[in-house]
Amino acid sequence: VAIRIIWSDIQD
């Protein structure tokens, strides 16, 4: 699961 990776990409 890469929810944190995706979320981080969106937050940036």
From Swiss-Prot:
Compartment(s) where it occurs, according to its Swiss-Prot or TrEMBL record: Secreted
Tissue: Expressed by the venom gland.
GO cellular component, one term: extracellular region
Disulfide bridge positions per record: none
Keywords: Secreted
Keyword Secreted: yes
Keyword Nucleus belongs to the record: no
Protein name in UniProt: Venom peptide 7
Natural source organism: Brotheas amazonicus (Scorpion)
